[in-house]
């Protein structure tokens, strides 16, 4: 029996390998409550590395992508934006300049050519990239960089015609550039879009229009909000409340939104009970299951004590129908210039924490992978 089981596993692995090779050029997609990558419908693990987009040393990019792929991680979320209001003098990477009432996309060596290199490298290694196209926050320019050039305020960003025209022009420049790349997992409308105190219709209408626009440019790839998952019924407390202008279920129902996204930062949100995060994951999964679309648990982390709490959240996500993948915040690396930015959430490759947050989790994902029915997001016996 032992030898038979070994033979079955070997043949199964060979079949999966052959299937993956045959489907390696296919585009990631959603199938029911599952994601499909390289022809395989399964649960996937990954991370975030915002800093990758701004590296200028190709060897550093290669090192990071190699370590990521070798670790068994599959989905990597990187920034697809870097908005400035004055052209940098130090060859700093930026993607768009907003100045004097106009916007210019930087397609040069310190612009979108940096994304070109990353995406090419991801293609070679079978890594799939989630790319948000603007930041709500001021880091790397954000929405306020548009406002500096065109006027207005944050709540008005979503409805300002001049701002939206510039944003759409940038979206078109980026999305059209990579329409045929199998490395793109999904385009995201923004990183953590909010509209504090606004009616939820503002973000919903903006997301409906923008997701349709992206699909018209690129029908090959998935589109998602990139939001934190705020706005759920049954609890009036933050972040379940609708204060930030988001309605998770309403936005998930948009036809051109392919999956739901959620983030989890108990400390930042003023939640003292970290086990609260398990319910946050389960409640979103229930909405995704009802909508028939998968959930991507795309950002989560703790400032220190990563193994204790993040492991619990990972186990909950892995065990909950409706959750299809998770990406911890964030992947850290030792580059030629030193360590990448340590925001206290960072888990560095090769560290002791890497084993529990990454290696052990990847192994658990592999166990589930062979028990997961296609399209159902359910468990085997």
UniProtKB/Swiss-Prot annotation:
Single GO biological process annotation from the record: mannan catabolic process
Sites carrying sugar chains: 100, 273, 334
Secretion signal span: 1-22
EC numbers on record: 3.2.1.78
Catalytic residue positions: 192 (proton donor), 299 (nucleophile)
Keyword presence, Translocase: no
Superkingdom of source: Eukaryota
Catalytic activity: Random hydrolysis of (1->4)-beta-D-mannosidic linkages in mannans, galactomannans and glucomannans
Molecular function GO labels: mannan endo-1,4-beta-mannosidase activity
Keywords: Carbohydrate metabolism, Glycoprotein, Glycosidase, Hydrolase, Secreted, Signal
GO cellular component: extracellular region
Role according to the record: Endo-1,4-mannanase, a crucial enzyme for depolymerization of seed galactomannans and wood galactoglucomannans.
Sequence similarity: Belongs to the glycosyl hydrolase 5 (cellulase A) family.
Protein name (database record): Mannan endo-1,4-beta-mannosidase D
Species this protein is from: Emericella nidulans (strain FGSC A4 / ATCC 38163 / CBS 112.46 / NRRL 194 / M139)
Lineage, top ranks: Eukaryota, Fungi, Dikarya, Ascomycota, Pezizomycotina
């Amino acid at each position: 029996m032992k030898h038979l089981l070994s033979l079955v596993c070997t043949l199964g692995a060979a079949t999966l390998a052959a299937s993956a090779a045959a489907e390696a050029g296919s585009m990631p997609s959603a199938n029911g409550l599952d994601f499909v990558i390289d022809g395989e419908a399964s649960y996937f693990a990954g991370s975030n590395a915002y800093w990758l987009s701004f590296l200028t040393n190709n060897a550093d990019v290669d090192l990071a992508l190699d370590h990521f792929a070798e670790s068994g991680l599959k989905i990597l979320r990187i920034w697809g934006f870097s908005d400035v209001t004055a052209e940098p003098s130090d060859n700093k990477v930026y993607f768009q300049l907003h100045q004097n009432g106009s916007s210019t996309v930087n397609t040069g060596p310190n612009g979108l050519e940096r994304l070109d290199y990353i995406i090419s490298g991801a293609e070679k290694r079978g890594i799939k990239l989630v790319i948000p196209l603007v930041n709500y926050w001021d880091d790397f320019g954000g929405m306020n960089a548009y406002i500096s050039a065109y006027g207005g305020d944050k709540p008005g960003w979503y409805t300002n015609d001049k701002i939206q025209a510039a944003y759409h022009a940038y979206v078109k420049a980026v999305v059209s550039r990579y329409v045929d790349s199998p490395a793109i997992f999904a385009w995201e409308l923004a990183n953590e879009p909010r509209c504090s105190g606004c009616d939820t219709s503002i973000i919903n209408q903006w997301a409906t229009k923008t997701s349709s626009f992206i699909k018209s440019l690129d029908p090959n790839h998935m589109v998602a909000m990139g939001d934190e998952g705020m706005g759920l019924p049954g609890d009036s407390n933050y972040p379940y409340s609708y204060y930030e202008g988001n309605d998770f279920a309403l936005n998930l129902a948009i036809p051109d939104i392919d999956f739901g996204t959620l983030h989890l930062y108990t400390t930042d949100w003023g939640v003292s009970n970290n086990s609260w995060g398990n319910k946050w994951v389960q409640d979103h999964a229930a909405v995704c299951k009802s909508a028939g679309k998968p959930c991507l648990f795309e950002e989560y982390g703790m400032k220190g004590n990563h193994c204790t709490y993040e492991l619990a959240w990972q186990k909950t996500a892995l065990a909950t129908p409706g959750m299809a993948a998770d990406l911890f915040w964030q992947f850290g690396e030792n580059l030629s210039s030193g360590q990448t930015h340590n925001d206290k959430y960072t888990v560095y490759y090769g560290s002791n924490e890497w084993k529990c947050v990454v290696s052990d989790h990847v192994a658990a994902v592999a166990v589930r992978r062979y028990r997961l029915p296609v399209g159902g997001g359910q468990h085997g016996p």
